[in-house]
Swiss-Prot record:
Enzyme active site: E47 (proton acceptor), D58 (proton acceptor)
Annotated pathway: Amino-acid biosynthesis; L-tryptophan biosynthesis; L-tryptophan from chorismate: step 5/5
Organism: Desulforapulum autotrophicum (strain ATCC 43914 / DSM 3382 / VKM B-1955 / HRM2)
Name by which UniProt lists this protein: Tryptophan synthase alpha chain
UniProt catalytic activity: (1S,2R)-1-C-(indol-3-yl)glycerol 3-phosphate + L-serine = D-glyceraldehyde 3-phosphate + L-tryptophan + H2O
Matching HAMAP family: Trp_synth_alpha (MF_00131)
CDD domains: Tryptophan_synthase_alpha (cd04724)
One annotated GO molecular function: tryptophan synthase activity
InterPro entries: Aldolase_TIM (IPR013785), RibuloseP-bd_barrel (IPR011060), Trp_synthase_alpha_AS (IPR018204), Trp_synthase_suA (IPR002028)
Gene Ontology CC entries for this record: cytosol
Keyword set, alphabetical order: Amino-acid biosynthesis, Aromatic amino acid biosynthesis, Lyase, Tryptophan biosynthesis
């Protein structure tokens, strides 16, 4: 179980690190090299994003990577094969991140069954609220996979309680309202929000949207269980190449 893995790792580390890649960006061979660099540098778990043409939760950096991957031929079946290879090769949990249109076109239950077949441990689908995702949640439960839902600073306490009840593995707490990759100021206001998140659930908390350096991660220690680095990883690849990935991850410790 994903939650059990996270709790075991947390006994060894003050905070875990989850990274994010867009499969097929800049191409599949390079994507696998990036995954390898991340794992060797000590990443604890990883989101594999299936590219989509209109990723509503993502800012310009990840949007651009989605569009480039699609232009390069990153289709769902190819992403499944990539994910299968990654999960077989590396001994960390991999999750899918994508949008409901991808599941709808593939078929929700076949999509979830495929996840189980290739050893993907859970999924983040930002545009699928639990009220509209009963078939998805049922399929995930049947396969013992983790549907991960999202809290934001604007989520009411009552809504947090409900979302947490429909979540397995961990809750993804976005550090601010908006899209990925923008500047986030990690302040006492965010600390108060994370305290609300902690009161809403006993599940581990992951925090993303704007996490980019050692200072951000230091701020999150004691407040969250997992720091999520997404857009900044793409910037590193674009500016420093694959060889910069491991150095960057080690700089976050």
């Amino acid at each position: 179980m994903l939650e059990a893995y996270i709790r075991e790792r947390r006994r060894q580390k003050e905070i875990l690190l989850m990274t994010h890649i867009v499969m097929g960006y800049p191409d599949f061979e390079t994507s696998m090299a990036i995954v390898e660099q991340m794992v060797e540098a000590g990443v604890d778990l990883m989101e594999l994003q299936i590219p989509f043409s209109e990723p509503m939760a993502d800012g310009p950096v990840i949007l651009g990577a989605n569009q480039a991957a699609l232009s390069g031929g990153a289709r769902v079946e190819r992403c499944f094969e990539f994910a299968r290879q990654a999960a077989a090769k590396f001994d960390i949990p991999f999750l899918f991140m994508t949008y409901y249109n991808i599941l709808f076109k593939y078929g929700v239950t076949p999509f979830v069954n495929k996840m189980a077949d290739i050893n993907i441990k859970g999924a983040i689908v930002p545009d699928l609220p639990p009220e509209e995702g009963q078939a998805y949640l049922k399929a995930m439960e049947e396969q013992n996979l983790s549907p991960i839902h999202i809290f934001s600073p604007r989520t009411s306490n009552e809504r947090m309680d409900f979302l947490a009840s429909q979540t397995r593995g961990f809750v993804y707490c976005v550090a601010r309202k908006g899209v990925t990759g923008k500047e986030t100021r990690f302040t006492e206001e965010i600390a108060g929000y994370l305290d609300r998140c902690r009161q809403a659930t006993t599940l581990p908390l992951a925090v993303g949207f704007g996490v980019k350096d050692e200072a951000d991660i230091a701020f999150l220690k004691g407040k969250a269980d997992i720091a999520v680095v997404g857009s900044e990883m793409i910037r590193v690849v674009e500016n420093q190449g694959v060889e910069g990935v491991g150095r960057f991850i080690q700089s976050l410790a």
